[in-house]
Design a protein with these regions (language model features):
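Generic structural signal for small/hydrophobic residues in well-ordered secondary structure
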Residues: 7-8, 44, 80, 111, ...
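Acidic, PIN/NYN-like endoribonuclease modules and their adjacent C-terminal/linker elements
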Residues: 1-3, 108-145
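Active-site neighborhoods of divalent-metal-dependent phosphate/nucleic-acid chemistry enzymes
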Residues: 69-117, 121
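Alpha-helix capping/helix-boundary segments
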Residues: 10-11, 40, 76, 107, ...
Length: 145
């Protein structure tokens, strides 16, 4: 299997379930190289409770040391804007909905550029984004969705 990138939804589940959740992240990767997006890192820092800040800091340090952090390029940002414009007209999204999707679209464009598969629990939005600009994504193994 190719490289994987976990969406924020996957890390949040792992943080909420503690050590068992971290073990499940390793099982999800199953020998595949795992990458971290700077977009996901931002979302984690913005939403983490104080007791889990060190876990996020460790993620940042470990992925940076391994040189496996994806940072969106100028082209990723431009493609994100174009995809969100199409998304809005195809799915009748208002401005608030587009703002919520910006990070997901940015994650999709940057991972897609690198040929990295996104693992996410957010099936609805990622399936729609992939119809507008193809990229590889999957639900976590064992997900009911």
């Amino acid at each position: 299997m190719g490289a994987l990138l976990f969406d924020t939804s996957i890390y949040i589940t792992a943080l909420r379930t503690g050590a068992e959740g971290n073990l499940n992240l390793r099982q999800l990767a199953a020998g595949s190289p795992v990458w971290l997006s700077s977009v996901v890192l931002e979302e984690l820092y913005a939403g983490v409770n104080p007791r889990d800040t060190r876990v996020v800091e460790r993620l940042e340090r470990d992925f940076t040391k391994a040189k496996r952090v994806i940072v969106p390029s100028l082209n990723d940002w431009a493609l994100t804007g174009k995809v969100l414009a199409r998304f809005s007209s195809e799915y009748d999204y208002e401005e608030i909905g587009k703002a919520r999707l910006t990070n997901d679209a940015l994650l999709a464009m940057s991972a897609g550029r690198q040929g990295i598969t996104i693992v996410t629990a957010n099936q609805r939005d990622f399936a729609r984004l992939a119809k507008l600009r193809p990229f590889s994504w999957q639900l976590p193994t064992g997900s009911a969705d």
